[in-house]
Amino acid sequence: ANGPYKIPNAQVDAYVYMTNKTLGTAYRGFGVTEVATAHERQMDRIAEKLGIDPLELRLKNVLQNGDVGITGEIMQTMAVKECLETAAANIGWKDLPDRWTDEEGNLCGKGIACFNKLTGTPSTTSVLVKMNENGSLYIMSASTEMGQGVTTTLPQIAAETLGMALEKISMAPVDTAITPYDKTTTSSRSTFHSGNAVLEACEDIKKQLCRLAAIKFGVAPEDVTYTADGYIQGRSRPEQRIHINDVGTSGILHEQPPVVAVGRYGTSDIFDPPPVDGRQSK
């Protein structure tokens, strides 16, 4: 929440309130846009008072790589200045008047604004996938369904990966006491992060099912292969063939450890921020 400008002096008072009343809030697009609208209106008013071009005022004050933000963080990959310069060049900022009337009599004007938004990285997600004794699949994920379709998307990914029928796959209700860790259900990240975690877990499920099928066939695990349509068959004896839905009902699971896999996906290697405590009054 640094904002895009250098602000060497600031004081922020924060208060925490506890309430038993449920809050109504937005699904997307809240917080940053409201604050950005306020500080960009302020920048325009300051520029007008000082008689400075609004673009010039912004370029003089934007944070750049190596600058220290208001919370004490060192800025990295900060390209606000370059973005402003590129936008201004593409719209012909210098050549446009502040206000004009077009051929149809419409009043026109020019404006420019900037803000920065956190990336949500580093970010990690874990899921747990379990093959039940009746051949169905159970996915445990902390990604919350709020209308975006995650309870459909994750089973679809599992169904395609394992070659299973979609109706054989279900999602567990979200409960932080039992579901694996997920950073947040925000930023349009559920399909990408949780989906990749489900994909990893299902690949592990494949290996476990191949091991169980090999026991049933009386062959080594490396002598069976997993087909795209959800069958496990022998390499040297293709007639040895069983569908994964039947592995659970064949009785093998009663004598072996449960088929459970944990999948994890993270983007921590993209950006590694330096460890900082921020700046606050003790």
Regions found by a protein language model. Give the residues of each.
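Mobile "lid/hinge" segments at catalytic clefts and subdomain interfaces of large enzymes
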Residues: 1-64, 202
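Cofactor-centric catalytic regions
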Residues: 1-5, 50, 56-162, 174-282
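Generic long, charged, amphipathic alpha-helical segments
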Residues: 167-173
